[in-house]
Amino acid sequence: MNALTPLSARLERSDGHALVTLARSRGAVRLRDLAQRGSAKAFLPRVEGDVPEVVFLNTSGGLTGGDRLSYRLEVGEGCRATATTQTAERAYAAGAGAARVEVLHEVGRDGWLDWLPQETILFEGAALERETQISLAPGAGCLMVESVVLGRAAMGETLSRLAFRDRRSILRGGKPVVVEPLALDDRALAAAGGAAMLGGARALATLAMVGPGAEDALGPARAALGEAGVEAAASAFDGKLVLRLLAADGWPLRRQVARLLTVLRGRALPRVWQV
């Protein structure tokens, strides 16, 4: 390499992987294994009560073309846990290729996981491919949320170039019970004001609860709706509850999501959500 080598050829792409395994031992849910490398980190803060929290962090500060990021959590039989991210994830303009994120969680028999990542903010020219999958053993359940914000309204940002593919799925006994693919590109952004697309919304979220008695949460969930500037729809059947939300800005969406999660969980959100 010499002084004439193009800067773009010298840029290093981030690559991170974090794996956390929780299991019941001596009457409590404890950390059994922790493996992490590169830009992906995981830590377990001190919390009140007997439900541990796992916080994942991308130390690279954001995602751009060619980056790789993987988060995995294994929740043992009869264990309950909450997992989240340290902050909002940001996907910046991609120089070449797409950033790829893989989130794979497994919940053992009669276990429960609240997967509560903070929102993903997409910037102009971002290229991101993400797969989120939660696999539930018999008797297990989960609560999952995914929020996406198209630029920062407060900064006057409007997106016209984007390549975003996002697939979220929940498997119960190896069979998919919730599958939600989302694809947004330049053409979709151009049509985003139409009723068939986002209706002018710049922020969207999906909440899904799967497990025994999930349908019973429909009433409390609907009662928790009503944040100004947020449109929402909720349905429940066959052991699952699904809510979809649209908003013109990320802040009212975040407030509505936080209220819903607090109601559905019956306790406060992880502290990192409150910072």
UniProtKB/Swiss-Prot annotation:
Domain of life the protein comes from: Bacteria
InterPro entries the UniProt entry points to: UreD
Keyword list, A-Z: Chaperone, Cytoplasm, Nickel insertion
GO cellular component, one term: cytoplasm
Molecular function via GO: nickel cation binding
Major localization class: cytoplasm
Coiled coil location: none
Cellular localisation: Cytoplasm
Keyword Cytoplasm: yes
One Pfam family cited in the UniProt record for this chain: UreD
Protein family per UniProt: Belongs to the UreD family.
PANTHER family xref list: UREASE ACCESSORY PROTEIN D
Function: Required for maturation of urease via the functional incorporation of the urease nickel metallocenter.
Complexes and interactors: UreD, UreF and UreG form a complex that acts as a GTP-hydrolysis-dependent molecular chaperone, activating the urease apoprotein by helping to assemble the nickel containing metallocenter of UreC. The UreE protein probably delivers the nickel.
Protein name as annotated: Urease accessory protein UreD
